[in-house]
Amino acid sequence: MRVFGWIAPVQVTPVELLVKACWWLAAGMALSAAVCWLVLDLLALPQFTEHSAIIVLLVILWFITLFALTMLFDRMKTLHAIGGLVLLSVIGGLLAASLFSLQLCLVLYGVTGGMFALGALIAHLYGERLRNGRFYWLLAAAGGVLAVVINLALEGDTAQWCTSLFLVVLFSVVSARKSPEMLDSARGLYRQQFVTVQHCATRGALSIWLGAATAFLDILQTLMFLVSSGSSSASR
């Protein structure tokens, strides 16, 4: 007989984990949008649009942050994961503000954040019925519909359409790929120590953010390789 057998951590359920991870990602996107609005509209800092040195500095800071968070991820507690999400959201917002217009920044973060907010509602209402990755198809569909509605309402140009739809696909695919890893991590944490759903959700949200950033860099590197290969072939 186990005297203290009744003392056990709450089982981490997949639906709870999805809902909270989606809300954390939506909150991160909202924070990035707020940073863009603060820099480009409220403070109207000309340095973010006139000086290329700011862009270079933010890109370097972005790479350092990604590398540091990736290396430290396995040892992160709840507050560390939240801090990582806040840091990524703030630096991402500053970098977006240095590269794009305020409208484009708000559209991109609004579409992506709205997609995850809708994903949280979908998971909360129908999560138990969604099997075999159907949740992520619905997540992508919700993001796609949101992107179409917002771009039609704002009469967005081609770049705005393509970028917003690209982010929907990117974050949906990365979320689907990170889902088994996130659930396995939750099971492992449950077996080893006392944990909360919030702990697993913040780590899951951070892993999706890091995965999306890494995937974007891989795509960018591939495109640069293809362009350089094409230009070298043409020069011959």
Where are these regions (language model features)?
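A hydrophobic alpha-helical transmembrane-helix feature that marks the membrane cores
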Residues: 1-236
